[in-house]
């Protein structure tokens, strides 16, 4: 099998990822589980050749120089793929994540109605958080697509690398990739404010300057979508504030309390039938109570505010997990493994 055949096999089997690792057969991740493909192990030369086949000259140069590289590419009629190529103790390796060519709608994702409302906010910051592989990019792509189909405006994305490719519908969409199109997230965000955007998607808010620029954009009348690798709304607030030096924390709390529209923290759960995965969400909205808690550094009290905020669309992760168990979508055991308070899910 060549790389295209392996990727076609991966897509056909609804795999989220294809793993290539010298010394072992190729493997795919299906519904969260890694499974071996029933072919002979690949040696270093084979894996290296497969990786080189899908790289351009710049990516090859970066791989040789830095020993690892991130990029994305598309196979017409199949899908788009996000790639991390690296080296390990047996030789070359790569993980290729499937990015569907067709962006799923919020309805197809069974997303809460509030996600559509958030996508149409005129300004402020909407953060989607969760561990790697929790579907953050899929959720954000659906929200951006909803805005694109509903309103007239300019959406600018800054990604590393570009994942979902958006077609301009009602909105003009410009997508920029760190490397080929801009030197850094920071440079792109500074430039973005002079590019007349209505909404900005920041692929990853990974450092102080990126977070500062994203918050500034939200504060100056733009809708900013962003991601963090935090597992809850409270941890997200802590993470943002902890990045800044002590003398700035009070000002940052004030900025965040003014600009935050929502934090959506999600995780993927295996369905009861074992035929797929479903997202479970904690949803915290920028209500006046939440804004006050951010301003007053009372992050620990957020959980109870979220718990009692169902009338406005808020929910804790455990509340959503409980609902999924009641609807027979996931098992109590699966919920217990994901829950903040596992004792709530006996059995």
Labelled PLM ranges:
Residues 1-347:
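Short, flexible helix-loop junctions that flank or precede catalytic/ligand sites
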